[in-house]
Curated annotation (Swiss-Prot):
EC number, as in UniProt: 2.7.4.3
Reaction equation(s) it catalyzes: AMP + ATP = 2 ADP
Family note: Belongs to the adenylate kinase family.
MF-aspect GO terms: adenylate kinase activity; ATP binding
HAMAP family named in the record: Adenylate_kinase_Adk
Location of the region described as LID in the Swiss-Prot/TrEMBL record: 122-159
Name of the encoding gene: adk
GO annotation (BP), single: AMP salvage
Name of the protein: Adenylate kinase
Length: 218
């Protein structure tokens, strides 16, 4: 199973990715992990990446694609792989096709923006323990304080409504066009691959998981 997982921040991709990895025995691959691993390994490509990152530059799509090809040639990718957060843009998707990297399935977990804003902006965290609450769905016994210590809860900057809306805007601008790209690619390919599926990301974890695995059978 060679899979691309799409979905806005807060749509629940990370949780479903774990289920998919366990069921299919495939690794999750993100560009951030690949870049860090390449730098740590000190490969020629990794040294090039380190120079770019140290100077504050952006790693080019060409280098990212080379890293992808290196990564998916490793033994743990024999059964396939799960791309999370990659490709992000049409040029990256086109480069993936040009490099001959085949994909079986593109799965989008869809949640409306307002639901995501509610999910993320309602989170409150006890920083010392990492305990996470939600003002609506998992409220502390006393508003604003941790159940166990009585210490104050905080809203992380990433979870503030303004930040969430900005991240969603970037997602819609950059990543949504990928859906049309892969639908078109599927329609034009002789084997109808990759299969594109959209799954409703609202409901219990079990319900969403069932929808995901049903979609992946197509």
């Amino acid at each position: 199973m060679r899979l691309i997982l799409l979905g806005a921040p807060g749509a629940g991709k990370g949780t479903q990715a774990k289920f998919i990895m366990e069921a299919y025995g495939v690794p999750q691959i993100s560009t951030g992990d690949m870049l860090r691993a390449a730098v740590k390994a000190g490969s020629p490509l990794g040294l090039k990446v380190k120079d770019i990152m140290t100077s504050g530059g952006l790693v080019s799509d060409d280098i990212i694609i080379d890293l992808v090809k290196e990564r998916i040639a490793e033994p743990d990718c024999q059964k396939g792989f799960l791309f999370d957060g990659f490709p992000r843009t049409i040029p990256q998707a086109e480069a993936l096709v040009a490099a001959g990297v085949n994909i079986d399935h593109v799965l989008e977990i869809f949640v409306e923006d307002e639901e995501i804003v509610s999910r993320l902006s309602g989170r409150r965290v006890h920083e010392a323990s990492g305990r996470v609450y939600h003002v609506k769905h998992n409220a502390p016994k006393t508003e604003g304080v941790d159940d166990e210590t009585g210490e104050p809860l905080v809203q992380r900057d990433d979870d503030k409504e303004e930040t969430v809306r900005k991240r969603l805007a970037v997602y819609h601008e950059q990543t949504e066009p990928l859906v049309d790209f892969y639908k078109k690619l599927s329609a034009e390919s002789s084997d109808s691959l990759p299969v594109y599926s959209r799954v409703d990301g609202i409901g219990s974890l079990d319900d969403i998981q069932a929808r995901v695995f049903e979609a992946l059978k197509k």
